[in-house]
């Protein structure tokens, strides 16, 4: 593993592992060579170093004879711990005063405040898991839906890493053969069969292309789908949002232009989080405030991953709808066209809009067609590929490394077509191995590790 220790890992770190604030319990975690001695110095009822691993002990925390709290101490002896070091977790009462006093006491006894993500960094540096798995720990902690939880869990257990590792192993074999040729350059010996190498690279590219393509779904599973509801004033946008959310989030009024700014909330559909933005209506504004809302609506449209265009079937003509659809087609984001208020004009729909395909008809007020709309939301983000248990890329860093790997592999193919010397071919293969190694941490730098783990919460 090409990495340098970014912090002194011979010391013992401590941090609050439970959320800040008052709670039933607070959990303080220590990791490092002095974790047992430091704990024993404030927990006199047990010699922590002498107890078996994975055991739990009840007793008092004492500071020079003064009892601070009655606690539960859990002992994990390295390497059978999260960090593969000696680890102690102290569960105390969740008073902010007790937690603060206990942390200060442990610091005085020789522990050091942990940096954000330092426990997980130590686990990575000690070989507990690779870098992609370490990043999945943070994703698991921040997961807020069934889908994001499932993807993070699969990655933390090594599913994604296994795919990358297999690709590297296949390439390493051919790289070694090409490198060996350089030692026999004067004899014109070819150890790496070029036909087999070309076949392998095409196979690897197919896997990488699938992983790159999966990022569009993986990213929205991890971060949610920014979804904008647009349409003319009084088309029923706020009513639709309220119906989807089953609560009154937006002001509903018969007065056109009531929604002057943005109302944001989240809807979970089969584990996928859609971050809905109900916008001001698209029309000529009658005052300065409303004009600002319309302008920002158009800005939100360009930033959205999904657009729901809602129109009133009662007051919209086919010509108007076709004109609006032309504007929607200019957007990069996929969109759904939804006709609202079918309860008021159901019989005339077929005649009026018979030449326009793909319209989803609903009544937001009567809750008609809402389930069909939800299924269309899932279909448009290609949700089926997630349900098939395919590996998904959710991390932008991994996505960029995969793209760079693909570029390097294209260079290898170009080099073989041009019959470049073996040393240049080997260089391009090494470059592809480098970018794959960036994902798992087989190739890493201090700056990269600092950047990744600094985004973790303290105590993890």
Swiss-Prot record:
One of its GO terms (biological process) is tRNA wobble uridine modification. CDD domains: trmE, TrmE_N. Its cofactor is K(+). Its EC number is 3.6.-.-. K(+) binds at residues 234, 253, 255, 258. It is found in: Cytoplasm. One of its GO terms (cellular component) is cytosol. It is an enzyme of class 3 (hydrolase). Homodimer. Heterotetramer of two MnmE and two MnmG subunits. Exhibits a very high intrinsic GTPase hydrolysis rate. Involved in the addition of a carboxymethylaminomethyl (cmnm) group at the wobble position (U34) of certain tRNAs, forming tRNA-cmnm(5)s(2)U34. This is tRNA modification GTPase MnmE.
């Amino acid at each position: 593993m090409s990495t340098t220790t970014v912090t002194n890992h011979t010391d013992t770190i401590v941090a609050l592992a439970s959320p800040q604030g008052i709670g039933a319990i607070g959990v303080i975690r220590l990791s490092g060579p002095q974790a047992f001695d430091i704990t024993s110095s404030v927990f006199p009822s047990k010699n922590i170093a002498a107890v078996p691993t994975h055991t739990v002990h009840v007793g008092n925390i004492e500071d020079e004879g003064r009892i601070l709290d009655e606690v539960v101490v859990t002992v994990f002896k390295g390497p059978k711990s999260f960090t593969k070091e000696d680890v102690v977790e102290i569960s105390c009462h969740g008073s902010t005063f007790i937690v603060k006093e206990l942390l200060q006491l442990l610091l005085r006894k020789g522990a050091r405040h942990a940096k954000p993500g330092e426990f997980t960094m130590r686990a990575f540096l000690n070989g507990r898991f690779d870098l992609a798995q370490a990043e999945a720990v943070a994703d698991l902690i921040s997961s807020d839906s069934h889908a994001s939880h499932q993807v993070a869990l699969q990655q933390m257990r090594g599913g994604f890493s296994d795919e990358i590792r297999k690709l590297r192993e296949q390439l390493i074999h051919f790289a070694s053969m090409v490198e060996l040729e350089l030692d026999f350059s004067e004899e014109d010996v070819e150890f790496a069969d070029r036909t087999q190498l070309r076949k392998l690279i095409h196979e690897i590219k197919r896997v990488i292309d699938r992983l790159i393509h999966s990022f569009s779904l993986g990213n929205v599973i991890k971060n949610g789908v920014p979804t904008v509801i647009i349409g003319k004033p009084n088309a029923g946008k706020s009513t639709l949002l309220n119906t989807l959310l089953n609560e009154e989030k937006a002001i509903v009024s018969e007065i056109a232009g009531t929604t002057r700014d943005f109302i944001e909330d989240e809807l979970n559909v089969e584990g996928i989080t859609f971050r809905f933005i109900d916008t001001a209506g698209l029309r000529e504004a009658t005052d300065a405030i409303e004009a600002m809302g319309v302008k920002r609506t158009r800005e939100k449209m360009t930033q959205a991953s999904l657009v729901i265009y809602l129109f009133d079937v009662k007051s919209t003509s086919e010509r108007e709808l076709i004109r609006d659809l032309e504007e929607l087609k200019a957007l990069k984001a996929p969109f759904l066209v939804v006709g609202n208020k079918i309860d008021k004009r159901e019989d005339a729909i077929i005649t009026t809009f018979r030449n326009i395909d793909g319209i989803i008809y609903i009544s937001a007020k009567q809750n008609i067609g809402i389930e069909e709309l939800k299924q269309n939301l899932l279909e448009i983000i290609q949700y089926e590929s997630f349900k098939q248990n395919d590996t998904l890329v959710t991390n932008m860093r991994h996505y960029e490394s995969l793209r760079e790997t693909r570029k390097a592999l294209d260079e290898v193919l170009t080099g073989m077509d041009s019959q470049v010397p073996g040393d240049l071919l080997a260089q391009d293969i090494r470059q592809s191995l480098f970018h794959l190694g960036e994902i798992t941490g087989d190739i890493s730098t201090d700056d990269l590790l600092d950047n990744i783990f600094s985004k973790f919460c303290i105590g993890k």
